[in-house]
A protein has these predicted regions:
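Flexible, low-complexity junctional segments that flank or bridge functional domains
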Residues: 1-187, 194
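C-terminal "post-core" interaction segments
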Residues: 103-111, 133-321
Length: 321
């Protein structure tokens, strides 16, 4: 993977919109407030090119070893005008991009134009998002946290495989396990959806502690996974599945069960651009045929839940307490 220098970043132009793949459909999730009526719209074409072809071309520009991670990475390129110029979809970075869209709950396609602007001007824009209310169990800036939800349900969110100076991981683990021992919840939900990895060993005492407490108390365990579950977090999900009586709930992971890793970097001598590369191939599951780790229970986020502030995966886990 090759990075970009500050000079190159300063020259990038983008359109004020953000797309996301929702169950295979490319959807407008962020737009200028003055254009908020297109939020939730499905994008059919860009400059007359079907989205399937756009994504197929853009997929060659990102490092990936499964479809889930590819879509997550490509989404970050779809508002950058140079992506379309490189793919031959746009002639230059100054002309408007034309998107054919079908509005949410609409029926007929229509054309919407977006004017490219310099990257540094983005902070001056008034942007609107389809997501206006985050659920209590949504993504947090904390590395890890725990809270009780519903009745007799403990929610443990683990967002990075590293320790936090404000509360070292061993302290957090001890507090969670002590709470379980004393309060005896009926269900534990472990959330790994936003964890991009780190040191997988840090969470193993929690996994082993959950296994022992589950044997003694008989509570159920659901492990939430998704497109943001990657690397060491994926290993922790596999460990939870193997060492405890648990279910994987959510969507296919961004990381693959068997994948390249142990990243190193080099600086290209002429451009000064930093490039990263993998040095090892890790086999986490010898029975896997490759690709994402699949959930036992599929719970795909939908636009209605996002707008209402409902956590689709947590709701699915709570259906069977």
């Amino acid at each position: 993977m090759v990075g970009m220098s500050p000079r190159i970043l300063a020259e990038i132009k983008a359109i004020p919109v953000q797309l996301q793949s929702m169950d295979g459909v490319w959807t407008i999730m962020v737009a200028e407030a003055s254009n908020a009526d297109i939020l939730g719209a499905t994008v059919l074409t860009v400059n007359g090119i079907p989205m399937e072809e756009v994504v197929a071309g853009a997929s060659k520009l990102v490092s990936h070893d499964n479809e889930t991670w590819m879509r997550l990475q490509v989404a970050q390129l779809l508002n950058i005008v140079d992506t379309y110029v490189y793919l031959g979809i746009a002639e230059n970075g100054d002309e408007d991009l034309r998107m054919t869209v079908v509005r949410h709950h609409g029926e007929l396609p229509e054309e919407v134009r977006f004017t490219p602007i310099p990257r540094e001007e983005f902070h001056e824009l008034d942007m609107a998002s389809w997501v206006s209310t985050l659920p209590p169990t949504g993504q947090s800036s904390d590395l890890y946290r725990a809270l009780t939800i519903a009745d007799d349900v403990l929610f443990v969110q683990y967002n990075a495989c590293r320790s936090w100076d404000a509360m070292p991981i061993e302290v957090f683990t001890a507090r969670v396990l002590d709470f379980i021992k004393e309060q005896r919840p009926k269900k534990i939900i472990v959330d790994l959806r936003y964890n991009g990895g780190g040191d997988s060993r840090l969470f193993e005492p929690m996994i082993d502690g959950l296994r022992e407490q589950q044997r003694q108390q008989g509570f159920s365990i659901d492990v939430l996974i998704g497109e943001g579950t990657f690397s060491s977090a994926l290993l922790n999900a596999i460990q939870l599945k193997r060492r405890t009586d648990s279910r994987l709930v959510g969507t296919p992971t961004g990381g693959s069960a068997n994948h390249f890793g142990e990243v190193k970097y080099l600086v290209l001598p002429n451009s000064g651009i930093r490039a990263t590369y993998s040095t090892k191939f890790f086999t986490m599951d010898g029975t896997s045929k490759g690709g994402s780790l699949e959930p036992d229970i599929i719970a795909k986020t939908n636009l209605e839940d996002l707008a209402a502030g409902i956590d689709t995966q947590v709701a699915a886990a709570l259906l069977d307490k």
